[in-house]
Amino acid sequence: MCGILAVLGCSDDSQAKRVRVLELSRRLKHRGPDWSGLDHHGDCYLAHQRLAIIDPASGDQPLYNEDKTIIVTVNGEIYNHEELRKGLPGHTFRTGSDCEVIAHLYEEHGESFIHMLDGIFSFVLLDSRNNSFVAARDAIGVTPLYIGWGLDGSVWISSEMKGLNDDCEHFKFFPPGHLYSSKEGSFKRWYNPPWFSEVIPSVPFDPLALRKAFEDAVIKRLMTDVPFGVLLSGGLDSSLVASVTARYLEGTKAAELWGTQLHSFCVGLEGSPDLKAAKEVANFLGTIHHEFHFTVQDGIDAIEDVIYHVETYDVTTIRASTPMFLMSRKIKSLGVKMVISGEGSDEIFGGYLYFHKAPNKEELHLETCHKIKALHQYDCLRANKATSAWGLEARVPFLDKEFVNVAMSIDPEWKMIKPDIGRIEKWILRRAFDDEENPYLPKHILYRQKEQFSDGVGYSWIDGLKAHSALHVTDKMMLNAAHIYPHNTPTTKEAYYYRMIFERFFPQIDSPWRSKCGLQHSKSY
């Protein structure tokens, strides 16, 4: 993943302002350590920190149309860029970057081109012909994006909060599936599939159709010009990602460049459930498996860095982000720049254990809709920022736009958990990949019950975090919690500890994590 920063409609075009924009952009350098770029046009600055995955040699940003009147800075991957290029025969491309197509599509189709993109993205596009700009974020919010406003009337857009919190009067999450137009001065939703209205779907479950949709999602994400691998915890989701990747790797450009044997990566405390399960799956699939160990103290020592990079004080997110953060550093040290990961399945298929309590299919469907809509604040945040902290890109096929649309169109009766007839959580996903003749996974892995990521890496991890937090937060401090933190008041010592660290890094009163911006924290146990 790359990092983008844009300052638009800025009243100050001095050299000092340019230096300041560069300084703020460097705060995102971990996201894109391969190249830094800046375009200054009139009262607008577009900065970019590049992680080179596609066309490393010539794809530096910002990117332009032929006469450089359209300027764009992008964080993302456009998986159908080759097909889109074929539909632009009159255009000349300067690079092989998948993102350059955005500038030419806008020139040809205006803002409506966004519906043509198949991928994940956050971008800011400046049209210097009329000094207007548009900014947009992908359907689910896989790529992070924030928008802020300055006292001078400027609009600021950044991949991370740390690019905005010192210079903006107010900032918030840029909503997923939306486009912001300076001409209108407002957001409009571009992603509005049938499931988004929360109407109960009625399409019968077709195992082969669901399998095909997921395989297509994984195959798209094999688009890379750099070494890659898969994150493998040994649970259902990551194991399916690894299995499909291994099955379809041969014959791809990635295989031609880096070989047909897939690399897999797992992290855990010594003796943790994930390490054991991941090794079994890796042996079954024949991957080159890399196992990383960490201690509870290693994780505790990394907490401040995790909160700084992931930019949250949500307890569950921090617990799960820390092992991922540590693993990402190890993976990057091996020369790998991209991994494929399994986030999103639990939200789509009702995989969390509390879904056992769903009273009917209507309530289950509504809850899955709400969980998917909130993903950008939790698992997407973790998967993107815990990896990007080390210049590693994570791709998440379960959150492929087309796959989500297929999975969310299925009658939710099929997602209901019914132990009496053998339907455990995510039964339809398991059933879709239950192939007797050419198995994707061993049966006991395919039907392994879900564990929380932070439990799977080792049961003592959470206990260690709670004990460490108790050393820093007293009972007396907890009595004043509602006065010190009136918004999203921490109710446990662990939550209070994370909040103290967060406030030290991001002290601005108006941050996206305030309740007025709609955040509801996930439950932790």
UniProtKB/Swiss-Prot annotation:
GO biological process: L-asparagine biosynthetic process
GO MF term list: asparagine synthase (glutamine-hydrolyzing) activity; ATP binding
Domain Asparagine synthetase as annotated: residue spans: 193-517
Keyword Signal: no
Site (Important for beta-aspartyl-AMP intermediate formation): E343
Disulphide connectivity of cysteines: none
Enzyme Commission designation: 6.3.5.4
Glutamine amidotransferase type-2 domain residues: 2-185
Enzyme class: ligase
Gene Ontology CC terms: cytosol
This protein's UniProt keywords: Amino-acid biosynthesis, Asparagine biosynthesis, ATP-binding, Glutamine amidotransferase, Ligase, Nucleotide-binding
Pathway: Amino-acid biosynthesis; L-asparagine biosynthesis; L-asparagine from L-aspartate (L-Gln route): step 1/1
Record: active site: C2 (for gatase activity)
Function: Could play a role in remobilization of nitrogen in flowers during senescence.
Protein known as: Asparagine synthetase [glutamine-hydrolyzing]
Organism, scientific name: Sandersonia aurantiaca
